[in-house]
Amino acid sequence: MSAISLINSGVAWFVAAAVLAFLFSFQKALSGWIAGIGGAVGSLYTAAAGFTVLTGAVGVSGALSLVSYDVQISPLNAIWLITLGLCGLFVSLYNIDWHRHAQVKCNGLQINMLMAAAVCAVIASNLGMFVVMAEIMALCAVFLTSNSKEGKLWFALGRLGTLLLAIACWLLWQRYGTLDLRLLDMRMQQLPLGSDIWLLGVIGFGLLAGIIPLHGWVPQAHANASAPAAALFSTVVMKIGLLGILTLSLLGGNAPLWWGIALLVLGMITAFVGGLYALMEHNIQRLLAYHTLENIGIILLGLGAGVTGIALEQPALIARGLVGGLYHLLNHSLFKSVLFLGAGSVWFRTGHRDIEKLGGIGKKMPVISIAMLVGLMAMAALPPLNGFAGEWVIYQSFFKLSNSGAFVARLLGPLLAVGLAITGALAVMCMAKVYGVTFLGAPRTKEAENATCAPLLMSVSVVALAICCVIGGVAAPWLLPMLSAAVPLPLEPANTTVSQPMITLLLIACPLLPFIIMAICKGDRLPSRSRGAAWVCGYDHEKSMVITAHGFAMPVKQALAPVLKLRKWLNPVSLVPGWQCEGSALLFRRMALVELAVLVVIIVSRGA
């Protein structure tokens, strides 16, 4: 099958699964199976289409028969298709067992519609259609939030972003007479894109991507959403915003230097602040949401380095920046899916998202515990996992930036490298905090003490994603050259070689070798050891003796108190009078439903 045929089949499966899951929503278990199987098949088709184009290194175009509009799949957006397909596959399988929980509501309609709209946005050949599909995707996500308050904030900020994007599209039409991306690219080679339109696009798509300070909806939406929904927010919805920013920045291939510098600065702020705020959180899903912001910033650093390379006409910098950013985009989606789905498995068995109420989960849920450890290590960019591989290439782009001709680039290169290293240290602290407080020590509540293993499909999905994280790190020397085909600019191969991180991975991982040998040699002697209670100065062990998440983060909280005080100023809710009114939440939800219905009718009528 051709890539276009695969995409048509994938979108058809998503839509069919959404409709059937809604029709059978009166039977929750059956609805879950329909949504899960249909979503998994649609995701497989989507990933296959992306893989076909990426390995072929040649873009294809055609029509999406369901809605009758032109689409294009380039090696660049093929990476988004692979990311959506892989994450959607395991989220869909996980979602089948998720429906077994008594407190869970049917979500097959929203999840599969979100996936279908996201795929259509990625392959859109027209910027206007891109914005419309991204809007449908965001509205589906609004209805996946746990309650009206979170959905209200997302809806309000989303409409602001859509308004800015609509203005940008209108200005593009006025200046270039088209919204077709291929025609825009050709015409902008003669008449470059204006910075006013670029700024509107960056703010509009930045609201969707969650770039700080445009991130207000991100922690609230993730905090109490279902695990499958939170995983899709992080791995699908926010990534579409990054695609929009990159698409605008690459049009015409003549970006000015300050665009790249602006993306680098925004990326560094987002990465550092996101990592810092994550360390202060105790709700595991809100914590992971802030870490998503951190990784959005890291991806933006890579993309910004690539755009800076375009302005400076440095092919090596373009290759390192874009390849590093794109590889980290894929890797982040994998390990963040592990973490959100793993956290959801813990909630499924304990009913708690507050890590202060957990503890000792590692003994109760060993499979999830090991998978979460892999995901947390990848999040902290520890070798030999995929999180390290992507960041290593981004570090290389900073080294190349330091050797460029522009003074501001030479100045930023070392500063960004140091800033990313500090952000990595915060991520390591957060990894130790989450795993230590949640999975080690003694249980702090009866629910944690009585936890049992997660259902089969949930465990399989989390473990499979964790294995993908290992493969993404170990197989980086073979995967990175494939991504070079996604760089949408003509480059000289001799000047764009990306240093493969395998040797560095192995060297850094060498200290683990003695521990592995010791575990193998002494494994048979461990059961014969006698065990007894630890000496605690004559007192019996109490639950209060275990280190808490609050205590773990206290030194950093005291050292960086001025930065943490900015949180209330970065929260848009505090700036809007009357926002907390109970009636406004229901009003916004109804407005979202009306807008979604209108957009769906318009899209369907185009294909009729």
Listing of model-derived features with the role each one plays in the protein:
Residues K28-G39, K152-R159, Q285, A289, ...:
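Alpha-helical transmembrane segments and their helix-start/interface "positive-inside/aromatic belt" motifs
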Residues S2-L6, S68-N77, G128, L184-L191, ...:
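Interfacial loop-to-helix junctions that mark the boundaries of transmembrane helices
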Residues A18-F22, G275, V434, L513-G523, ...:
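Alpha-helical transmembrane segments
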Residues I37-G50, G161-C169, M372-P384, S461-W478, ...:
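Hydrophobic alpha-helical membrane-insertion segments
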Residues M1-S9, A16-L109, G177-Q189, A485, ...:
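Transmembrane helix-loop-helix hairpins at membrane boundaries of multipass inner-membrane proteins
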Residues A57-L66, R182-M186, V393-V408, W478-V498:
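Membrane-interfacial helical/loop segments at transmembrane boundaries in membrane proteins
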Residues F90-R100, K105-F130, L139-N450:
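Hydrophobic transmembrane alpha-helices and their helix-loop junctions in integral membrane proteins
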Residues L479-L505, C521-A608:
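Aromatic-capped, Gly/Pro-kinked transmembrane alpha-helices
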